[in-house]
């Protein structure tokens, strides 16, 4: 049952990642429409051969996924709006919150350390 609970907790993060990747793929395909093939000197590179082979293998799956998700009507502006709202709600004050938490943790740890330390070693030297 514990494994199922962990899977359910990870599901929203996984869905967000899949959604972001699908939107990025859709935006990139729109940006590359109408471009020609790479120049001949790039075609001969081994890395470009690997890239082209991966593209051959993955392009049908990406196209099918994009077609299936098309009914959602997601666009770049929709994703940007969602990400901006998420940032405003959860991440805007992350720096100050983290700094405060670290200072409180440090103070708490020092207090625990002093309480465990023998009086002879940790006595205030006033």
Swiss-Prot record:
Subcellular localization: Secreted
GO cellular component terms, A-Z: high-density lipoprotein particle; very-low-density lipoprotein particle
Keyword Cell membrane assigned: no
Signal sequence annotation: 1-27
UniProt superkingdom: Eukaryota
Entry keywords, A to Z: Lipid transport, Secreted, Signal, Transport
One Gene Ontology term from the biological process aspect of the record: triglyceride homeostasis
Biological role: May participate in lipoprotein metabolism.
Homology family: Belongs to the apolipoprotein C4 family.
Name of the protein in its database record: Apolipoprotein C-IV
Organism name: Aotus nancymaae
Annotated gene: APOC4
């Amino acid at each position: 049952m514990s494994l199922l609970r962990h899977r359910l907790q990870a599901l929203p993060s996984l869905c967000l990642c899949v959604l972001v990747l699908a939107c990025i793929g859709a935006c990139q395909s729109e940006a590359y429409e109408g471009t020609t093939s790479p120049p001949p000197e790039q075609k001969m590179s081994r890395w470009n051969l690997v890239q082209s082979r991966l593209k051959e293998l993955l392009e049908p799956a990406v196209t099918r996924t994009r077609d299936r998700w098309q009914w959602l009507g997601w666009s770049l502006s929709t994703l940007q709006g969602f990400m901006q709202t998420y940032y405003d709600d959860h991440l805007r004050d992350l720096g100050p919150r983290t700094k405060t938490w670290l200072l409180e943790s440090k103070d708490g740890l020092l207090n625990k350390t002093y309480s465990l330390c023998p009086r002879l070693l940790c006595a205030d030297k006033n």
